[in-house]
């Protein structure tokens, strides 16, 4: 009787330790987020050690629920850009179409160049949209194919400071490609593609 009792006590102690270890063990080395759309989910790994300010700001928006019922609203394809411009391919999203008043109140994120971060605009890179350096906030884009023009020192901006890359799609690139092929009017998705939410994993 006592033998069974001690065996059971030891078993439950082991299970408790296992559960505690599982809870304390991080699932990922870097934070991951899931972009939820009707076309499927896009999993993105973020790089806080390389682009700490960009990642911190983006995660603060994710945690606050800012991206709930937002959208992908802009698309660049080779065929929808003027023949005189450099060609790039991407999808851009955020709250600009769904809550532009809120977007205008958000503080700018200090610009982290790809020269500083070491990140490049390759297929699946997520990066902050901006006008002038330090003006980026809630809006972001995902590269479809390699886009070196968006890196530091290249031609996407007159200031040649590039855009602030801060993560990469690690699962669901087929969803990005599917969204990229949806109908557009000029550079605008028609209709916009709903982002149901962006959540931490």
Regions found by a protein language model. Name each.
Residues 1-29:
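Bacterial Sec-dependent N-terminal signal peptides
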Residues 21-201:
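Cyclophilin-like peptidyl-prolyl cis-trans isomerases
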């Amino acid at each position: 009787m006592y033998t069974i009792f001690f065996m059971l006590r030891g078993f439950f102690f082991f299970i408790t330790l296992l559960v505690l270890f599982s809870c304390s063990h991080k699932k990922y080395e870097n934070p991951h987020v899931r972009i939820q759309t009707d076309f499927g989910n896009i999993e993105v790994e973020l790089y806080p050690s390389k682009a700490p300010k960009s990642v911190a700001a983006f995660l603060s928006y994710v945690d606050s629920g800012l991206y709930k019922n937002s959208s992908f609203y802009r698309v660049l394809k080779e065929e929808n850009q003027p023949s005189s411009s450099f060609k790039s391919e991407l999808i851009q999203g955020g709250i600009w179409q769904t809550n532009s008043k809120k977007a205008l109140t958000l503080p700018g994120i200090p610009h982290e160049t790809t020269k500083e971060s070491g990140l490049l605009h390759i297929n699946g890179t997520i990066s902050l949209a901006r006008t002038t350096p330090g003006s980026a906030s809630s809006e972001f884009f995902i590269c479809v194919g390699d886009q070196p023009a968006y890196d530091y020192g290249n031609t996407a901006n007159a200031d040649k400071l590039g855009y602030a890359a801060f993560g990469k799609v690690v699962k669901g690139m087929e969803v990005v490609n599917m969204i990229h092929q949806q109908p557009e009017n000029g550079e605008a998705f028609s209709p916009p593609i709903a982002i149901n939410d962006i959540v931490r994993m």
